[in-house]
Amino acid sequence: MARILGVDIPDNKRGEIALTYIFGIGRSSANQILAAAGVNKDKRVSSWTDEESQTIRTVINENYKVEGELKSEIRLNIKRLVDIGCYRGRRHVLGLPVRGQSTKNNARTRKGKRKTVANKKKAAKK
């Protein structure tokens, strides 16, 4: 297994797919990285040379925020929204959808498990 930026990259996968195991790198940016490094995207990770691995590392380090650096930036962005007290920040605090989705019926992922409230008992008829 090749290690790039502290992440184990699977040997049996193509380079284009293997790089997506790094947080912050998707298919599109993986293709851009491999093109900049001059590595064929269909080449398996196990057949990469040490020089190719090193050039991929340098391209990622110079041009992309990945893993811990990206996660901390995301965390700081959310903290900033909460601190200034804007609508999006309040939605983050309440654990509700941030991007304007309706919450009357759905939004179970953000709201969590249902909190069922019992109905009032109806008075017996005479």
UniProtKB/Swiss-Prot annotation:
Q: Which UniProt keywords apply?
A: Ribonucleoprotein, Ribosomal protein, RNA-binding, rRNA-binding, tRNA-binding
Regions of biased composition (Basic residues) lie at 107-126
UniProt keyword annotation of Ribosomal protein present: yes
Gene Ontology molecular function: any one: structural constituent of ribosome
Claim: Heme is one of the keywords in the record: no
Name any Gene Ontology BP term. Answer: translation
Alphabetical GO CC annotations of the entry are: cytosol; small ribosomal subunit
Region labeled Disordered — which residues? 98-126
Primary role = Located at the top of the head of the 30S subunit, it contacts several helices of the 16S rRNA. In the 70S ribosome it contacts the 23S rRNA (bridge B1a) and protein L5 of the 50S subunit (bridge B1b), connecting the 2 subunits; these bridges are implicated in subunit movement. Contacts the tRNAs in the A and P-sites.
Which family does the record claim for this protein?
Answer: Belongs to the universal ribosomal protein uS13 family.
Assembly and partners are described as: Part of the 30S ribosomal subunit. Forms a loose heterodimer with protein S19. Forms two bridges to the 50S subunit in the 70S ribosome.
Name it: Small ribosomal subunit protein uS13
Identify the species of origin.
Answer: Amoebophilus asiaticus (strain 5a2)
